[in-house]
């Protein structure tokens, strides 16, 4: 009884000091393993909203909204624009980005534009049109915009970038959950799942959980071999190709 009373006494100041809403998020999978037969996965993001004393509960006039953003590791990428010359498609202009998320998916309880203004969207990178990409050249703004749209559209076609408005369900203004699809072509690396609590056009709280996407089985062995000993990996690949070619030729001669 004394220990319980002491715990309550220690927790009381923390509870009284809570001046802002707090998010307690989690994800259904902290690790996603990619094997040869991997066809994609469904990720469940869920959690609770802890309102401080005196904070009104969600209602029709002052709703509480939740936005979840899943990001893959950043990478450098070069986007090339093709041009048709004399009936042949050739590479024309190009623009290199030093940093672009390899995967970006955003789910929200309502459309993002209904929740916050343009400035807030840009600060927190809420939405595909608010991604802060980093072109390495000093190309004119209209050229940068054209290439950025091309990059986003390319990754949308591969299901690596997408938006899912109304995909976050909030229950009684306290619990929330969202299901997000991870495509088969997802890159490996350290992912983050960021959750934002929004009310009256302001971000009141945020929390992050990490997700590890990695190869497993034979694919993991091959990837590690390529990273740790690229020279031996190259020799092995060449030797294997020669052996398979010789074997195919021998079988063809017998037939």
Regions found by a protein language model. Give the residues of each.
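Hydrophobic h-region of N-terminal signal peptides that target proteins for export
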Residues: 8-18
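N-terminal edge beta-strand
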Residues: 21-36
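Membrane-embedded segments
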Residues: 48, 66-95
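Short solvent-exposed capping/turn motifs at the termini of beta-strands
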Residues: 49-53
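Membrane-proximal low-complexity regions enriched in glycine and acidic/polar residues
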Residues: 84-183, 187
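Short, aromatic-rich amphipathic segments at membrane interfaces
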Residues: 181, 204-234
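Extended, hydrophilic extramembrane loops/domains of integral membrane proteins
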Residues: 185-215
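Juxtamembrane interface at the cytosolic side of transmembrane helices
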Residues: 241-255
């Amino acid at each position: 009884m004394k220990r319980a009373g002491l715990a309550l006494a220690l927790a009381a100041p923390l509870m009284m000091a809570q001046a802002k809403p707090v998010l307690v998020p989690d994800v259904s999978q902290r690790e996603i393993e990619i094997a040869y037969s991997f066809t994609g996965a469904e990720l469940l993001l869920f959690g609770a909203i802890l309102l401080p004393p005196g904070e009104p509960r969600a209602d029709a006039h002052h709703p509480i909204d939740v936005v979840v953003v899943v990001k893959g590791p950043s990478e450098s990428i070069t986007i090339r624009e093709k041009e048709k010359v004399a009936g042949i498609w050739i590479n024309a202009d190009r623009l290199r980005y030093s940093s672009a998320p390899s995967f970006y998916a955003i789910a929200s309880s309502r459309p993002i534009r209904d929740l916050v203004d343009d400035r807030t969207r840009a600060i927190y990178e809420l939405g595909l049109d608010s991604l802060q990409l980093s072109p390495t050249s000093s190309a004119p703004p209209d050229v940068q915009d054209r290439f950025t749209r091309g990059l986003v559209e390319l990754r949308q076609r591969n299901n690596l970038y997408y938006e899912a408005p109304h995909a976050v369900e909030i229950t009684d203004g306290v619990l929330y959950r969202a299901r997000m699809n991870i495509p088969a072509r997802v890159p490996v690396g350290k992912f983050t799942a960021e959750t934002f609590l929004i009310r009256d056009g302001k971000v009141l709280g945020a929390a992050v959980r990490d997700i590890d996407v990695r190869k497993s089985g034979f694919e993991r062995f091959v990837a590690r071999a390529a990273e740790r000993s690229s020279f031996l990996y190259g020799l092995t690949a060449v030797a294997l190709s020669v052996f398979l070619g010789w074997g195919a030729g021998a079988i063809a001669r017998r037939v």
